[in-house]
Curated annotation (Swiss-Prot):
Tissue: Seed.
Record-listed Ca(2+) binding positions: 125, 129, 132
UniProt PTM: Partially N-glycosylated at Asn-111 and Asn-183 with the heptasaccharide [(beta-xylosyl-1,2)(alpha-mannosyl-1,6)(alpha-mannosyl-1,3)]beta-manosyl-1,4-GlcNAC-beta-1,4-GlcNAc-beta-1,4 [alpha-fucosyl-1,3]GlcNAc. A small proportion of alpha chains are proteolytically cleaved at 114-115 into gamma and beta chains. This is probably dependent on the deglycosylation of Asn-111.
Disulfide bond entries: none
InterPro entries named in the record: ConA-like_dom_sf, L-lectin, Lectin_LegA_CS, Lectin_legB_Mn/Ca_BS, Legume_lectin_dom, Leguminous_Lectin
Binding site for Mn(2+): 123, 125, 132, 137
Protein name: Seed lectin
Pfam family, one: Lectin_legB
Keyword RNA-binding: no
Length: 240
């Protein structure tokens, strides 16, 4: 079987194994800061993404097999005005040559003109766009900015959120959970996702985030740590 596994307890300010896109950078303290901060304050119209450098084999056409994976990370979203937040952060899988898309509500993952962008994402969405439910939510997105499944999210300003996302290939189940250790609340959402029809055989995995498009709807998006493991079974693994 093919196994990819990596873990960052913090990030290197000059990362060799992370591709930074847009405004993303690693701070001197080892935080992955996806959107821009100036004089300690988040900036509007910011878009940043970070990808693990090595492409990952997510399914194999010759054997018809699909990988299972699990990832966990911690992040903080902090807003100067907690009644005005935008726009959110996502974990995503996309083709290896993936580039930042539209900012604002499109979370750097999608745009309104190209409807065929191959991207599977779990979004932590802090602003209700026209296509969104009316509250902050955690959504599963398959080749669309509109979530196919979502759960309401009681976002906590400036608090560390622990996320665990898993994909079980045998049942095609993508599950995401978010927990706030500070008040022991948690949220879970899952959906049936066929990675083989949604994505190419090889992908890159990573994060994308955008701040709002007006000066008063802004927030920070910082990833503190990240681990990931995927396993693509070889045909011989179960021949007997």
């Amino acid at each position: 079987s093919e196994v990819v596994s990596f873990s960052f307890t913090k990030f290197n300010p000059n990362p060799k194994d992370i591709i930074l896109q847009g405004d993303a950078l690693v701070t001197s303290k080892g935080k992955l800061q996806l959107t821009k901060v100036k004089d300690g304050k988040p900036v509007d119209h910011s878009l940043g993404r970070a990808l693990y450098a090595a492409p990952i084999h997510i399914w194999d056409d010759s054997t018809d097999r699909v990988a299972s994976f699990a990832t966990s990370f911690s992040f903080v979203v902090e807003a100067p005005d907690e009644s005005k937040t935008a726009d959110g952060i996502a974990f995503f899988l996309a083709p290896p040559d993936t580039q930042p898309q539209k900012d604002g509500g499109f979370l750097g993952l999608f745009n309104d003109s190209n409807k065929s962008i191959q991207t599977v994402a779990v979004e932590f969405d802090t602003f209700s766009n026209t296509w969104d439910p009316s509250a902050r939510h955690i959504g599963i997105n398959v080749n669309s900015i509109e979530s196919m499944k979502y759960v309401k999210w009681g976002w906590e300003n400036g608090k560390v959120a622990n996320v665990y996302i898993s994909y079980e290939a045998s049942t095609k189940t993508l599950t995401a959970s978010l927990t706030y250790p500070s008040n022991a609340t948690s949220y879970i959402v899952s959906a049936n996702v066929d990675l083989k029809s949604a994505l190419p055989e090889w992908v890159r995995v990573g994060f994308s985030a955008t701040s709002g498009l007006s000066r008063d709807h802004v927030e920070t998006h910082d990833v503190l740590d990240w681990s990931f493991t995927s396993t693509l079974q070889a045909p011989s693994d179960d021949s007997n």
